[in-house]
Amino acid sequence: MRLAILSDIHGNPIALDAVLADIQSQGAVDAYWVLGDFAALGYDPVTPLEKVTALSHARFTRGNTDRYMVTGDLPVQPEKAREDPALLLQVIEAARSFSWTKGYLSAAGWLDWLANLPLEVRLTLPDGTRLLGVHASPGRDDGPGIQYQHSDGKLEKRLAGCEADLVIVGHTHVPLDRQIGRIRAINLGSISNPVTSGLQATYVLLDADEHGYNIQLRRVDYDREAVIKAIEQSHHPTPSFLIGFMRGERVLSSDPGFFQAGRRAQNQKEK
């Protein structure tokens, strides 16, 4: 069986189209998992939702920004700006950006769909490996997520009690492959809003049979100049923030081999 697992599309159908084309170039997949952050912080909130919900055998989870669309929460809470006035501009820009996105989603009738997204998806692979897909970390669609700079001890606490052997997440936009005790943790990166130096879209292909599974991180180029032009034409209220991602102004990591692409993993459960 083969799964294509992606996350963090962030309202960028140009990047999504490039990834879907790459998936097709690799042969047929049995199912798609999309792990949240579909619409916000992008120039086109609606088209990616139309595209992913048209995929065959697709399952979805919510991301933190999907929840914000429903609840009205913001990534930076207004009360924080009272404690730190330097955050005031971030609060104002976040409110404008999320309000703009929510308006489009509401007009197109997508808010109820977002409101009903599950927190996680699960599957038992043919070899018995228990797979968990969630946006940020087990039990959460927000927070620090699964990050490469975190110690094994910190990640072990974050993964505790998840009842899975393999956990795949997004949220941080930085790919990662770590063995934490008996749990393998994979961060697939992001489709859009890159924060690693390659500025590519990244996603995971998972091949599994009764002997084990293989995970491949795919890196996909897309036309970032076309994205910039689309942002400029979209009347998004904070275009410079979005364009900054496309121009590499928000790079957090050079991504120096944190992901062991193509590693073959055998079932590690006790016999």
What are the roles of these predicted feature ranges?
Residues L6-S7, Y32-D37, R59-N64, V134, ...:
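Active-site neighborhood of phospho(di)ester-bond hydrolases with catalytic His/Asp-centered motifs
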Residues I23-A28, L55, L125-D127, G161-E163, ...:
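Glycine-rich phosphate-binding loop signature in dinucleotide/nucleotide-binding domains
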Residues M1-A4, L123-L132, I180-R184, G212-N214:
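Beta-strand-turn-beta hairpins that frame and shape the catalytic cleft
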Residues M1-L55:
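N-terminal active-site segment of His-dependent metallophosphoesterases
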Residues Q26, G103-Q179:
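His/acidic metal-ligating clusters that form di-metal
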Residues R178-K271:
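Acidic, His/Gly-rich catalytic cores of divalent-metal-dependent hydrolytic chemistry
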Residues H10-A15, A40-Y43, T65-V70, L166-Q179, ...:
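Active-site environment of divalent metal-dependent phosphoester hydrolases
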Residues L55-V121, Q149-E163:
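Active-site neighborhood of divalent metal-dependent phosphoester bond hydrolases
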